UniProtKB/Swiss-Prot annotation:
Residues 239-250, 962-972 have a biased composition (Pro residues). Residues 885-894 have a biased composition (Basic residues). It is a multi-pass membrane protein. Residues 1-405, 474-497, 544-549, 662-1161 are cytoplasmic. The lineage of its organism: Eukaryota, Metazoa, Chordata, Craniata, Vertebrata. This is Voltage-gated inwardly rectifying potassium channel KCNH2. Detected in heart, both in atrium and in left ventricle. Pfam families: cNMP_binding (PF00027), Ion_trans (PF00520), PAS_9 (PF13426). The chain crosses the membrane at residues 406-426, 453-473, 498-518, 523-543, 550-570, 641-661. Residues 233-286, 872-985, 1121-1161 are annotated as: Disordered. GO terms for cellular component: monoatomic ion channel complex; plasma membrane. It comes from Oryctolagus cuniculus (Rabbit). It is found in: Cell membrane.
Length: 1161
């Protein structure tokens, strides 16, 4: 396996840095996008949600001016300051009164901080909220609602309280001259000039609105007031409001959508404007500023409004808030200009605008920087790190820090590995052989290290080990969170807790510390402490444990190294006993005798060091492998005890290595084979499809990241080998964090959680990976468990989501999956839990008692559904609105009836053209009965979102011919009186059977008639069977269901009888088509004229076989089950609704023409 590099891909740690710095200080903040209209909120932390009482889903996509927190006591001037700071992309502190969702008021200090990207452009704003005072605790009246309404009695106390707070500062105005002169410096006298920070009074409920990109025009005469007049205007006098373009009332709120095609927010970034605009103090942004301006007795020197403040502003640019500004100094052209021209901004249709260009005169520089007296990073307590930039950032590496995966560190590690191997081999050899030989040999000349090359190498090794310790203090490491740590302090602490002690003991140069003491044996023993470095070798070589060949080689080297150590010990035992032994039976004496180099009486002589070492190594290898030949044998007790130990070690080594070599190779190659097999497949795929290099690198990095995360374990393959009950427990354990902490799952039972855990799947995404593309089908719901993502529409960031956020679409509102309205891209390494739509609905169907709780508790942080790409959405009943009803009711007839039941009496409220037979449509000229044949057909089902009174109305074909009177419908059927009185409760039976009557009418009279689709009066369920047909009363749902079933049975019977009647009609037509009489008949063939033939014999007519009578009989049969008390509709003209037998007599006057040659005559 390669070196564990950690998360080294470029990540956007903007959100993580802000959260890490703010959460520990209980900060309450929001993040807004500066590149979209109204600066929509794209992130808010939990502290802000707790402060205002709104959930994150309710705050997302709202304007960052937080106008939804405004209330009666919200100062208009403070709201204007926030809007001006957003317009000018400048830092500012504003004190403002906000209202929570429950209506309680609190005084808040808002810090507006711009955030720049790597190019120096402001792309985001951070607004930090700090509660200064709870206004309910200082004697405020009953809780005010944060919804604007008409002025009430609390206005005067609220205004007086605010005035008392500002009075000491306002009285200081008498000690200075006015800084505003007519036509003087600053451009105050210029026509159309607008002073931004003007109002110190709280905003009253208004009927006008002011968007972020618009500033109201003030009266020009305010700029020319003197000191006394100015103070008087502030204390008591109020100027009339400026003229508006229209004298009538205007809406109090003008909505600005973030995107016309988006469905995220419909709120506006607007601040209210009082009808009574009080006089203003020019160039004063707060009461403290007014106090500070008292010291300046002389007015500022004259300068143009657009350039006068440019020079002091250059020094203010050094107060940077981003990394890019700390690196380079942006030119003055990159900052917001002092003068903004209203030609480039969007006009307000509710405010009057002069023909000349209007300018916003920016406050003076003291006002611009008065509320920001220190760096924003210090104000927001960001510590040493400056405000992060919103961009992909590689892991920040400290200066003089070495990456643990860098090429230099890899080469250095291999060098240290070679030195450790040298130490492991030569340190025992020197301690056992060379030091004793030096003591016994002649005295060495005074040549220092030149005569001892091993001593020089040992000195170099000691120096290299000390340097390695210093390098380890500056080498990065990977923590438990897979993050690369480069901070020197954290690296030092990590090294002290780890391998520092072992490395330090192994690097001590003992031969230099006790040089000249004469104790060479002690130095040799102390130098064996270098063998502790072997632990580092084991740690370094652990990365190669996945490769079977490397493991086998390491085991063989370990076996040889142990044999080398044992050979040194074997020689030390024989050398220690040789001088003190009277009998010459030791293995060294036997070796000297065999080689002809015996030891003399003084203990000198004997074999050479080379012969001794080779013989000792031969003995240890033969003993470890259990292949002893006997030519070198232990004779003394010490030698025999040592031989026993060697045999025990050899048996263990032989059994564990050589006896199981095949098993070891097979075991070690299993994971390696899987890794290389998968990597080979990936590379073959890349080669076959010719994947470009950037994409190829992403594939390989993702594969390595996924392999290090899962170690190549296929979770699905592992789970399939266990029973389902055990699979559910394992999945419940793997998803325990999500199921325990996510609010929608808290009320679920254990069985429901087990079923949900079986459906969840975990997804890992590296930085820059796109999880969902715009236009993709939304088939799953995503839960973020680690990392942060961004949602983009084009190149515009609309939301930043972090841990515990949910994105997707509300499945309970839509019957079919929709399409995504943006791209979802990972900013950091992310772990997400996703559950497919069908799986979630299946589980909720199995546990209906939990379904309602889940849908009510589920808050999707960002809705990805694009309602504009699906026909009929967002309110079409084909896609949404009553999803549970569509799942339970499959018949369209029942769905239409339920909608009519839920909206009784709403047909008449739809207005002209919506009800087919209502009075509103009849009274309109050219109503639905008089429309031209070219009019298009009506929609079969109306959207539920279009209005509360709209309901689906079925279509029917009606004959359309020449114009008729306004009160008469097509086919000669005027509207009945009861239907006119209650258009929403027309007779359902007549509506259901009218199609049958029209069929026969079409056969009877088809000349000059056309057909078009016209909406009928909807037939509500309560007026079906045994109640008065004109009654608009409502019935319980169970009664409606029973009556629907009865109506369905009647329709079935009608269909059966209609089929029989049709067969009779076809038989009659076949008889009339017989033109040639039979041979036995005396009747001649009739002439060509259709009316010249008359029957020879008088034949009684058959009323039951006529077309009209068949229609009447069918309607009578369909209504025969009506109760006796059911009233009848009054008949007008030839209307055939609910025909009775008494009407059949008038139809017998038309005889049926038959040929006299008919056999039945």
């Amino acid at each position: 396996m390669p070196v564990r590099r950690g998360h080294v891909a470029p990540q956007n740690t903007f959100l993580d840095t802000i959260i890490r710095k703010f959460e520990g200080q209980s900060r309450k903040f929001i993040i807004a996008n500066a590149r979209v209209e109204n600066c929509a909120v794209i992130y808010c932390n939990d502290g802000f949600c707790e402060l205002c009482g709104y959930s994150r889903a309710e705050v997302m996509q709202r304007p960052c001016t937080c106008d939804f927190l405004h209330g009666p006591r919200t100062q208009r001037r403070a709201a204007a300051q926030i809007a001006q700071a957003l317009l000018g992309a400048e830092e500012r502190k504003v004190e403002i009164a906000f209202y929570r969702k429950d209506g309680s008021c609190f005084l808040c200090l808002v810090d507006v901080v711009p955030v720049k990207n790597e190019d120096g452009a402001v792309i985001m704003f951070i607004l930090n909220f700090e509660v200064v005072m709870e206004k309910d605790m200082v004697g405020s009246p009953a809780r005010d609602t944060n919804h604007r309404g008409p002025p009430t009695s609390w206005l005067a106390p609220g205004r007086a309280k605010t005035f008392r707070l500002k009075l000491p500062a306002l009285l200081a105005l008498t000690a200075r001259e006015s800084s505003v002169r007519p036509g003087g410096a600053g451009g105050a006298g210029a026509p159309g000039a607008v002073v931004v920070d003007v109002d110190l009074t709280p905003a009253a409920p208004s009927s006008e609105s002011l968007a972020l990109d618009e500033v109201p025009a003030m009266d020009n005469h305010v700029a020319g007031l003197g000191p006394a007049e100015e103070r008087r205007a502030l204390v008591g006098s109020c100027s009339p409001p400026p003229p508006v373009s229209a004298p009538g009332p205007h809406p109090s709120l003008r909505a600005h959508s973030l995107n016309p095609d988006a469905s995220g927010s419909s709120c506006s970034l607007a601040r209210t404007r009082s009808r009574e605009s009080c006089a203003s103090v020019r160039r004063a942004s707060s009461a403290d500023d007014i106090e500070a301006m008292r010291a300046g007795a002389l007015p500022p020197p004259p300068r143009h409004a657009s350039t006068g403040a440019m020079h002091p502003l250059r020094s203010g640019l050094l107060n940077s808030t981003s990394d890019s500004d700390l690196v380079r100094y942006r030119t003055i052209s990159k900052i917001p200009q002092i003068t903004l021209n209203f030609v480039d901004l969007k006009g307000d249709p509710f405010l009057a605008s002069p023909t000349s260009d209007r300018e916003i005169i920016a406050p003076k520089i003291k006002e611009r920087t008065h509320n920001v007296t220190e760096k924003v990073t210090q104000v927001l307590s960001l510590g040493a790190d400056v405000l992060p930039e919103y961009k992909l950032q590689a892991p920040r590496i400290h200066r003089w820090t070495i990456l643990h995966y860098s090429p230099f560190k890899a080469v250095w590690d291999w060098l240290i590995l070679l030195l450790v191997i040298y130490t492991a081999v030569f340190t025992p050899y020197s301690a056992a052989f060379l030091l004793k030989e030096t003591e016994e040999g002649p005295p060495a000349p005074e040549c220092g290290y030149a005569c001892q090359p091993l001593a020089v190498v040992d000195l170099i090794v000691d120096i290299m080990f000390i340097v390695d310790i210093l390098i380890n203090f500056r080498t990065t490491y990977v923590n438990a969170n897979e993050e690369v740590v480069s901070h020197p302090g954290r690296i030092a602490v990590h090294y002290f807790k780890g391998w520092f002690l072992i490395d330090m003991v192994a690097a001590i140069p003992f031969d230099l510390l006790i040089f000249g003491s004469g104790s060479e044996e002690l130095i040799g023993l102390l130098k064996t402490a270098r063998l502790l470095r072997l632990v580092r070798v084991a740690r370094k070589l652990d990365r190669y444990s996945e490769y079977g060949a490397a493991v086998l080689l390491l085991l063989m080297c370990t076996f040889a190294l142990i044999a080398h150590w044992l050979a040194c010990i074997w020689y030390a035992i024989g050398n220690m006993e040789q001088p003190h032994m009277d009998s010459r039976i030791g293995w060294l004496h036997n070796l000297g005798d065999q080689m002809g180099k015996p030891y003399n009486s003084s203990g000198l002589g004997g074999p050479s060091i080379k012969d001794k070492y080779v013989t000792g190594l031969y003995f240890t290898f033969s003993s470890l492998t259990s292949v002893g030949f006997g030519n070198v044998s232990p004779n003394t007790n010490s030698e025999k005890i040592f031989s026993i130990c060697v045999m025990l070690i050899g048996s263990l080594m032989y059994a564990s290595i050589f006896g199981n070599v095949s098993a070891i190779i097979q075991r070690l190659y299993s994971g390696t084979a899987r890794y290389h097999t998968q990597m080979l497949r990936v590379r073959e795929f890349i080669r076959f499809h010719q994947i470009p290099n950037p994409l190829r690198q992403r594939l390989e990095e993702y594969f390595q990241h996924a392999w290090s995360y899962t170690n190549g374990i296929d979770m699905n393959a592992v789970l399939k080998g266990f029973p389902e009950c055990l699979q559910a427990d394992i999945c419940l354990h793997l998803n325990r964090s999500l199921l325990q902490h996510c609010k929608p799952f808290r009320g679920a039972t254990k069985d429901c959680l087990r079923a949900l855990a079986m459906k969840f799947k975990t997804t890992h995404a590296p930085p820059g990976d796109t999880l969902v593309h715009a236009g993709d089908l939304l088939t799953a719901l995503y839960f973020i468990s680690r990392g942060s993502i961004e949602i983009l529409r084009g190149d515009v960031v609309v939301a930043i989501l972090g841990k515990n956020d949910i994105f997707g679409e509300p499945l309970n509102l839509y019957a079919r999956p929709g399409k995504s309205n943006g791209d979802v891209r990972a900013l950091t390494y992310c772990d997400l839990h996703k559950i497919h739509r069908d799986d979630l609905l299946e589980v909720l169907d199995m546990y209906p008692e939990f379904s309602d709780h889940f849908w009510s508790s589920l808050e999707i942080t960002f809705n990805l559904r694009d309602t504009n790409m699906i026909p009929g959405s967002p309110g079409s009943t084909e896609w949404e609105g009553g999803f549970n009803r569509q799942r339970k009711r499959k018949l369209s007839f029942r769905r239409r009836t339920d909608k009519d039941t839920e909206q009784p009496g709403e047909v008449s409220a739809l207005g002209p053209g919506r009800a087919g037979a209502g009075p509103s449509s009849r009274g309109r000229p050219g109503g639905p009965w008089g429309e031209s044949p070219s009019s298009g057909p009506s929609s079969p089902e109306s959207s539920e979102d279009e209005g509360p009174g709209r309901s689906s109305s079925p279509l029917r074909l009606v004959p359309f011919s020449s114009p008729r009177p306004p009160g008469e419908p097509p086919g000669g059927e005027p509207l009945t009186e009861d239907c006119e009185k209650s258009s929403d409760t027309c007779n359902p039976l007549s509506g259901a059977f009218s199609g049958v009557s029209n069929i026969f009418s079409f056969w009877g009279d088809s000349r000059g008639r056309q057909y078009q689709e016209l909406p009928r009066c909807p037939a509500p369920a309560p007026s079906l069977l045994n109640i008065p047909l004109s009654s608009p009363s409502r019935r319980p749902r169970g009664d409606v269901e029973s009556r629907l079933d009865a109506l369905q049975r009647q329709l079935n019977r009608l269909e059966t009888r209609l089929s029989a009647d049709m067969a009779t009609v076809l038989q009659l037509l076949q008889r009339q088509m017989t033109l040639v009489p039979p041979a036995y008949s005396a009747v001649t063939t009739p002439g060509p004229g259709p009316t010249s033939t008359s029957p020879l014999l008088p034949v009684s007519p058959f009323p039951t076989l006529t077309l009209d009578s068949l229609s009447q009989v069918s309607q009578f049969m369909a209504c025969e089950e009506l109760p006796p008390g059911a009233p009848e509709l009054p008949q007008e003209g030839p209307t055939r609704r609910l025909s009775l037998p008494g009407q059949l007599g008038a139809l017998t006057s038309q005889p049926l023409h038959r040929h006299g040659s008919d056999p039945g005559s």
